[in-house]
């Protein structure tokens, strides 16, 4: 899956419908709480899901600032979940 962001395009691993449904439950709960610590943990989980492992995620996202990385990862989460309105988790 290709995800377009204002920082470029990112090729992300595909997931199954079952995996997407399981993650959707988690994403909904975290979005509802607006807990930034949980949101950052979720973003880290999706970075590994999208890119395969921590090293690949670091290679791909390592040149971004923390806020830019948050924006990219939130866009990736929303793309996986089919959510159109992003939630701002930066800064």
Stretches with model-predicted labels:
Residues 1-8:
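Short acidic-hydrophobic surface loop/beta-edge motif
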Residues 10-12:
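Short hydrophobic-aromatic micro-motifs
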Residues 14-91:
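Short, surface-exposed, charged amphipathic helix/loop patches that serve as local interaction elements
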């Amino acid at each position: 899956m290709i995800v377009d962001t204002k920082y470029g395009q990112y090729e992300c691993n595909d997931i199954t419908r079952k995996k997407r449904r399981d993650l959707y439950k988690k994403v909904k709960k975290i979005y509802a709480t607006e807990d930034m610590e949980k949101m950052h943990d979720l973003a880290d989980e999706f970075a590994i899901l999208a890119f395969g492992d921590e090293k690949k995620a670091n290679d791909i996202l390592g040149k971004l600032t923390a806020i830019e990385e948050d924006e990219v990862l939130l866009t990736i989460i929303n793309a996986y979940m089919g959510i159109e309105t992003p939630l701002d988790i930066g800064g």
